[in-house]
Regions:
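Catalytic histidine-centered segment of alpha/beta-hydrolase-like enzymes
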Residues: 164-175
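Conserved alpha/beta-hydrolase catalytic His-Asp/Glu region
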Residues: 63-118
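Gly/Ala-rich beta-loop-alpha elbow adjacent to hydrolase catalytic centers
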Residues: 13, 17, 21
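Short beta-strand immediately N-terminal to the catalytic nucleophile in serine-hydrolase-like folds
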Residues: 11-13, 38
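Flexible "cap/lid" loop of the alpha/beta hydrolase fold
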Residues: 23-26, 31-65
Length: 187
């Protein structure tokens, strides 16, 4: 950010990106004028994350594109427009050596990633304007009560909670509302 920005900026982060944004704001408040956290994944239950990691490890790929698509549609991508979902599949689904398909990711890195989501809530410095969007269709929620309580206590009137009627893929399911939340924080 020192190289790319002329000064402090508003940082927007979705899911794990929200965790990164919170950590950056806590470590380098001089770089941040505000945060927009889109269903951030922070301080999640370790048992839940272990289950997710175990599921990924036991079944990291799909028979074909249709199966991968169905898994997305049946999960948190159900509200994402078809063209956006197809773009995701085109860009990130790759052929595996055994004739199956999988996501263009590192499975070992992803298994480690799930444990990162269990870390405690890093609260930005007092006075950091922060908007958190919580997706209400996610159960259990990624934006936990613990996270919201910590931010309310640490930021007071500088914290805004928005609860949206959608699943976890907030920026893709609600692009107009997401853009408005970002514009509001930039103002």
């Amino acid at each position: 950010m020192d190289a790319e920005a002329d000064g402090p900026v508003v940082v927007v982060g979705h899911s794990f990106g929200g965790a990164i944004a919170l950590n950056l704001a806590a470590a380098r408040p001089d770089l941040i004028t505000g945060l927009v956290l889109l269903d951030p994944a922070v301080a999640l239950d370790g048992r839940w994350m272990r289950e997710v990691a175990d599921d990924m490890y036991s079944s990291p790929d799909y028979t074909d594109r249709a199966e991968a698509r169905q898994e997305k549609v049946g999960g948190s991508w159900g509200e994402v427009p078809d063209d956006e979902l197809d773009r995701e599949l085109d860009e990130h689904l790759v052929d595996a050596a055994d004739g199956r398909v999988g996501w263009r990711i590192s499975i070992p890195a992803m298994l480690s990633y799930w444990s990162e989501l269990t870390r405690p809530v890093p609260v930005p410095r007092d006075g950091t304007p922060t908007t958190l969007v919580r997706a209400t269709h996610t159960d259990p929620p990624y934006a936990s009560d613990e996270l919201i309580t910590a931010l309310e206590a640490g930021l007071g009137p500088n914290f805004t909670l928005l609860e949206w009627d959608c699943d976890h893929m907030v920026p893709l399911a609600k692009p107009t509302e997401t853009a408005a939340a970002i514009r509001d924080r930039l103002a």
